[in-house]
Regions:
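Solvent-exposed interaction patches of small proteins and small membrane subunits
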Residues: 1-137
Length: 137
């Protein structure tokens, strides 16, 4: 794949990430959520998380990395490259994303929503800022 296409790919993915982040922000800004809104917040988290790790993967591949096979690899390599800072919280987000895709349990849902509001949303905001600076290069 030519360099130009790889460049466009991560930038296009980043644009989609920003749209997902804007949707997630609506839930975060609302604060107290009904059960139905919690389900919507979880879905918004899932979309945002998926796009976040794919942005990391595409950007790292643009930088020459080739051995990224999933979100865990992308997170680890992005942490090593200094793109993301809190590797532990990113791995917590990975675990939460796995939980939301394999089971629905009201208690788990509330735990995930709490983590999204307090931990993961700030991670996504930080990633957005970092990628904006890289976009401007």
């Amino acid at each position: 794949m030519p360099e130009l296409n790889k460049d466009i790919r991560w930038q296009q993915r980043f644009a989609n990430f920003r749209k997902a982040l804007a949707q997630l922000k609506k839930f975060v800004d609302k604060g107290e959520l009904t059960e139905l809104e919690e389900q919507g917040a979880i879905q918004a988290f899932e979309y945002t998380y998926e796009l976040a790790w794919l942005v990391l993967k595409d950007f790292l591949e643009y930088q020459g990395q080739t051995d990224i096979y999933g979100s865990r690899d992308a997170i680890q390599k992005a942490f090593q490259a200094g793109i993301i800072e809190d590797g532990e919280k990113w791995m917590d987000a990975y675990v939460s994303r796995t939980k939301t895709s394999h089971t629905y349990n009201e208690e788990t849902a509330r735990e995930v929503v709490d983590a999204v509001m307090n931990d993961y949303y700030p991670l996504f905001i930080d990633l957005n800022r970092k990628m904006e600076t890289l976009l401007d290069r």
